[in-house]
Swiss-Prot record:
Transmembrane annotation, as ranges: none
Pathway membership, UniProt: Amino-acid biosynthesis; L-histidine biosynthesis; L-histidine from 5-phospho-alpha-D-ribose 1-diphosphate: step 4/9
Enzyme superclass (EC): isomerase
Database matches in SUPFAM superfamilies: Ribulose-phoshate binding barrel
Name listed for the protein in its UniProt record: 1-(5-phosphoribosyl)-5-[(5-phosphoribosylamino)methylideneamino] imidazole-4-carboxamide isomerase
Record family assignment: Belongs to the HisA/HisF family.
Species this protein is from: Desulfatibacillum aliphaticivorans
Residues at the active site: 8, 129
Amino acid sequence: MIVIPAVDIRQGKCVRLSQGRADAQTVYSDDPAAMAAKWEGMGAARIHVVDLDGAFEKTPKNLGAIKKILETVKKPVQVGGGIRDLATMETYLDLGVSNIIIGTEAIRNPEMVKDACKRFPGKIIVGIDAKEGMVAVEGWTETTSVRAVDLARSFEDAGVAAINFTDIHRDGMQTGPNIEQTRAFAQAISIPVVASGGVSTIKDIKAVKTLAKDGVVGVITGRALYVGTLDLAEAVSEAMEGVDPDYNPF
């Protein structure tokens, strides 16, 4: 299992939000690229980048900051936030982004997502954010009546590289990941799952690691790294114990 540090960008700065709320923001760095380089230096296999302005405004807003990250780190960089069309995906991929994360459009326009999987094979990750098991969209501001597991199942044959599954109630709260919900979600589908939300300590990494047999191939962590309750090097060592160091689930 790989540990993927999150670099969330808002107005060019590296920030973290609590439960996706724009009014609950903490700024951790004015230089997202330097932060990405720090995580790479501590053993990150890839970097998870979110354009928060893009997520809220429905169009990419931090291309400059993301381009600088791509120029700074050598590890794969996956990007999400405000990606609503094939042209934007192509722009990111041409810049050197390894994987595109599609969230809201996965439920708004699933056919476009399936088309993207055909046009950019192995490059598309679907981000499913759940609130009490139901899909949340538009930067987590709207909860739908669609079950997260049903949305995931609809992409079973599309060629999706992975699904990032986020429990919104846990994200940015450091309350521990929802292990049972994540296990049930991963067991219900055949697509590799990356867990997200609630990781706060090495104990949580160990807990998520037990889900590897259920199809969880990675875990995204953010605030815990920034506030210091989780050491990335230790987390990577724990997650990759007994695993080929070149392991790449994507």
